[in-house]
A protein has these predicted regions:
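A short beta-strand motif that forms the metal-chelation/ATP-contact edge
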Residues: 207, 216-218, 275-288
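Gly/Ser/Thr-rich active-site loops/lids in small-molecule metabolic enzymes
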Residues: 239, 291, 297-309
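A long amphipathic alpha-helix within ATP-dependent nucleotide-binding catalytic cores
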Residues: 183-189, 227-279
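Active-site nucleotide/adenylate-binding loops and adjacent lid/helix of ATP-dependent enzymes
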Residues: 106-192, 199, 211-213, 235-244
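Peripheral (often C-terminal) accessory segments that flank ATP-dependent C-N-forming ligase machineries
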Residues: 305-426
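Membrane-embedded hairpin module used as a gating/binding unit in multi-pass transport
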Residues: 197-223
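ATP-binding N-terminal substructure of ATP-dependent carboxylate-amine bond-forming enzymes
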Residues: 1-101
Length: 426
């Protein structure tokens, strides 16, 4: 993952010895293992339904003991977030290593959409109208009472097939609504949440929290599949509002939280006598590192120092004699992934030209312009001139290996996230 590689490079640039560990699906080596910043790399067992996270946690514990690790920075994906909470408890119980990871209970609460919203409301913080539903009947009962309000159905679990479905409910006609809901598997074992649709711009944040203090923070515009990163100015009103929400959330949650905390926000605008009012609604929480960490490329040493405060005692708000301040990217580059842009902006529009799709020529020209602009003035989220091999391996070995595995196993996928190396099944 790009976020893990970015963090590894940050610690390396700050003068630390860095050990890497990751899953290697289908036996294809991940690109991060070839980075010059790693002193050693460990391939981890992936949690599964048969053995749970037992082997995964044991692999991590063995690596921590063997390498005498001082601090473990979790960089989990959506599918192993809770397992990392379990690993944190085991590692800190059996070693002196400090984990940058929430405990199992906190991770599970924040990871699930419905429990996160309930927790947020319990903290007396704003949250969108959200309902837990375990049957189609429950969905229709709520929709039938809705007046001038639309909702979006979201699966509570990890469901790649429905993740990109942002269908507004109710549909224009009753029959369309019933037909859409009928195609969804909504049961007690497969619960969903019905969340009020908030028209407005979407934003995401990334924060490092150590012992209840926000050490690192950034906010940026977001989308359903975010592949272009541009940090908001830290002094902008929206960025400050999202930072304040994060700090309030951490303070009210108590227990000296330590881990990564990322929120997805929607901003609702409404007119009033005082002018245009903006209301910030958190719609989802990711209790793990966010890819937006790449935006701290120019602040590697400062960011690494934020993590190391987990090892240092704090006296009167100061660590190692230095007063704490929140690290934010001052003038970061804009980030993209060349493989994604090449396909989405150039190759896909080119294919549409050959099949004579309407507007394809204009789409191709505009796409080429954007691609060249990104190539010249933006920064690739994986490439570094002094550490080029991970970038080369990602596109020439890792992804071809993944595509070949899908063909051999006849596994269908609908899209990929190049930055997280996630393939969305369908």
């Amino acid at each position: 993952m790009a976020k893990g590689l970015s963090l590894a490079r940050a610690f390396y640039q700050a003068g630390h010895r860095v050990i890497g560990a990751d899953f290697e699906p289908y036996g294809v080596p991940v690109n991060g293992r070839f980075s010059v910043v790693l002193s050693k790399f460990y391939s981890l067992s992936r949690p599964n339904s048969k053995d749970g996270a037992t082997h995964y946690i044991q692999d991590l514990l063995s690596a921590v003991r063997r390498e005498k690790v001082d601090i473990w920075v979790s960089c989990s994906g959506v599918a192993s977030a809770v397992e990392d909470g379990q690993a944190k408890e085991v590692i800190e119980r059996h070693t002196r290593c400090r984990a940058i990871q929430f405990d199992t209970k906190t991770t599970a609460t924040l990871h699930e959409k419905h429990s996160f919203i309930q927790h947020t409301k319990g903290l007396a913080l704003p949250a969108p109208e959200t309902y837990d539903v375990t049957s189609r009947t429950a969905v229709h009962n709520i929709l039938n009472d809705a007046e001038d309000v639309h909702y979006i159905l979201k699966s509570v679990g990890v469901d790649d097939a429905s993740r990109g479905d942002l269908t507004l409910l109710p549909r224009p006609t009753l029959s369309e609504t019933y037909q859409h809901v009928a195609n969804l598997k909504i049961t007690n074992d497969s619960p969903w949440v019905l969340q009020r649709f908030i028209p407005g711009e979407e934003y995401c944040t990334h924060a490092l929290v150590v012992d209840g203090d926000v050490k690192v923070f950034v906010a940026c515009p977001s989308s359903e599949l975010l592949m272009h990163y541009e940090a908001m100015h830290p002094r902008s009103s929206l960025s400050k509002a999202m930072l304040k929400f994060t700090q309030e959330f951490v303070a009210r949650s108590g227990d000296g939280m330590t881990g990564h905390l990322s929120f997805d926000f929607l901003v609702e605008e409404s007119a009033s006598e005082k002018g245009l009012q903006k209301v910030l609604y958190p719609i989802e929480c990711n209790p793990r590192a966010h890819t937006a960490v790449v935006l701290f490329d120019q602040h590697a040493a400062e960011m690494a120092e934020g993590y190391l405060t987990a090892l240092a005692p704090e006296i009167n708000g100061a660590v190692n004699g230095l007063k704490h301040r929140i690290v934010v990217p001052a003038k970061p580059a804009k980030y993209y992934w060349v493989g994604y842009d090449l396909v989405s902006l150039v190759l896909y529009p080119l294919i549409r030209i050959f099949i004579l799709s309407p507007g394809s020529v204009r789409e191709f020209i505009e796409g080429c312009y954007l691609f060249i602009q990104h190539l010249l003035f933006w920064k690739d989220g994986t490439y570094e001139m002094w550490d080029p091999l991970p970038w080369w391996w990602l596109y020439h070995v890792y992804w071809p290996g993944q595509f070949l595995a899908c063909i051999l196993q006849r596994r269908n996928w609908s899209r990929i996230n190049v930055s997280t190396t996630k393939m969305f099944n369908c």
